[in-house]
Amino acid sequence: RFAPGIPVLRYHGTARSLDGLRPDTIVLTTYGVARREAAALAAHPWGLIAADEAQAIKNPISRTAKALRTIPADARFALTGTPVENRLVDLWALLDWTTPGLLGPLDRFRREIAVPVERDRDPDAAESLARLVRPFLLRRRKSDPDIAPDLPPKTETDRVVPLTTEQVTLYKATVDEVM
């Protein structure tokens, strides 16, 4: 819709192939395929790698995060609605993938930033981190007037759904076990 002339290749399924890949092609794949096919993907020059729903790489020691780090690219960016879910190491992992070295090695980041902020509530460490990452984070909200004006308002509907007989039995067994 926005760039109909740009070729797009779906690299997914059993018949996937990168044969005849042109430099201007956008390649779409899944994290699972990227993890399994990292060597094949790393054999090609990439101008840009974009990780959508990048919470999939927030654990820096996961197989997926490690695999994506082996695929060289001139630039990388990560899209996520939750850059930090549980700990600051989530943020370190995303930024170390997009901008290697920005926050230093993981052990130093933990020692100098994560522990002081998370455990000690150190405002100086928090401000230092905020200053470092501010240029790399873009926070947008659906309420911002320029963000997707054609999106309808959010609608929430509660529906009562009865449990099946099996679900009732499992629920009662769990309650009895816990109580």
Model region roles, listed by residue range:
Residues 88:
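Conserved AAA+/SF3 P-loop NTPase catalytic/coupling segment centered on the Walker-B
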Residues 14-48, 59-63:
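Conserved helix/coil segment N-terminal to the catalytic DExD/H
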Residues 5, 73, 175:
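ATP/adenylate-binding site constellation spanning eukaryotic-like Ser/Thr protein kinases
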Residues 42-79:
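SF2 helicase catalytic motif II
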Residues 92-104:
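A short helix-turn-beta junction within AAA+ P-loop NTPase domains corresponding to the substrate/partner-engaging
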Residues 28-34, 39-43, 102-179:
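Inter-lobe coupling linker of SF2 helicases/translocases
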Residues 1-12, 102:
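Conserved helix-turn-beta segment of the N-terminal RecA-like "Helicase ATP-binding" lobe
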